[in-house]
Amino acid sequence: MKPVIALIGRPNVGKSTLFNRLTRSRDALVADLPGLTRDRHYGEGRVGERPFLVIDTGGFEPVAKEGIMHEMAKQTKQAVAEADVVIFIVDGRQGLTPHDKTITDFLRKSGRSVMLVVNKAEGMKYTTVTADFYELGMGDPYVISAAHGDGVNDLVEEALNIAFAQRPPEEEAPASNDRSIKLAIVGRPNVGKSTLVNTLLGEERVIAFDLPGTTRDSIEIPFERDGKHYTLIDTAGIRRRGKVFEAIEKFSVVKTLQSISEANVVLLLLDAQQDISEQDAHIAGFILESGRALVVGVNKWDGLTSDRRDEIKMDLERKLSFLSFAKTHFVSALKSSGIGPMMKSVDGAYAAAMSNLSTPKLTRALIEAVEHQQPRRKGSIRPKLRYAHQGGMNPPIVVIHGNALEAIDANYKRFLEKHFRETFSLVGTPLRIELRSGKNPFSRSEK
């Protein structure tokens, strides 16, 4: 399980800047306006070989009673509850404020490990920038500049050390078939995940094992369907009650992200009785960014009028067009309708994600693509695409070598992606294209 780090602090202390540096993204909007980040933002980071999840929160006012600041306080409290370590950020330029003291009181009661971090400390002596903050009684502060990156790596290394040190030893996971497909079923609350889980895990097909006792554990449930082996990855709290498994529907973004990161294939479940929501799109976006193979299931399809079905299909095309590489199935988990074909698509998506693409075939496909459509010139320079090879699986990565490839635009990369998909029947998996300019090591004339 990846450690979870929450970034907490009053408005405008640099939480989003630190989030962007940790995740190497611009996902959270950054500007000098208090309260600009309205909701929790989630991202993946990595220090060396150690991955982690990071939560960026809105500016925290624990005692806010109404309005947007009240909603942001609720979101922040949830982030603290989900975190292994809390990084409490204060502003070294402004010094200690009453607001910082209020947040300290809340964090002290939370029971979480808290690291006090003084940001915006560039050009200032440690003793000068930290002096006021000892009053908070949270030990020696860490000093960083999120904008310039000073001290950030050391901070995260220590946060991860704390997170791992406080975790209990991991119990041995239940035995599963090495060839099984690890499947995560994700979606917002009440779309029917628990019903689908029970349909897939019919008691006669479940391999018996002891469930971990805490919802923070990752649960792996091996099962077999139509002769195929799967392992259901669940961190949302599946519990045995009597003779059935019951999935708790309480939605947790962190647990959803953990499930996605541990899976081979993700089944995104939507509710046909409701329009596609912003939350649906956010989950879909993270699946895409994670590079996981994907199947979309639209549940509660039975009983809908033809007009409503048309509306849902249009909604899918409009709001989730970036998932066009994945197959969509219209199902009823309650009546077990359409489940078989959907699971066949799970198998197909996994096979596509694990495709072994030979260098000669990739290079041939690349040459065919260039013959069909050459990249545009950039000024006097036209990119030369020479050969391609596979750079990884799950998702497949196609590495293209040539000259002046930095001049290739996003439209041409999409054209190449589409061509490789069609050539190698890559349905249900993201496909990454990497461009590398330089000499062809296989060319005798360039040795």
From Swiss-Prot:
Keywords: GTP-binding, Nucleotide-binding, Repeat, Ribosome biogenesis. GO terms for biological process: ribosome biogenesis. GTP 1 binds at residues 9-16, 56-60, 119-122. Residues 355-439 form the KH-like domain. It comes from the Bacteria. Pfam families: KH_dom-like, MMR_HSR1. Residues 3-167, 181-354 form the EngA-type G domain. One of its GO terms (molecular function) is ribosome binding. GTP 2 binds at residues 187-194, 234-238, 299-302. InterPro entries: G_ENGA, GTP-bd, GTPase_Der, KH_dom-like, KH_dom-like_a/b, P-loop_NTPase, Small_GTP-bd. NCBIfam families: GTPase_EngA, small_GTP. Belongs to the TRAFAC class TrmE-Era-EngA-EngB-Septin-like GTPase superfamily. EngA (Der) GTPase family. Associates with the 50S ribosomal subunit. GTPase that plays an essential role in the late steps of ribosome biogenesis. This is GTPase Der. It comes from Janthinobacterium sp. (strain Marseille).
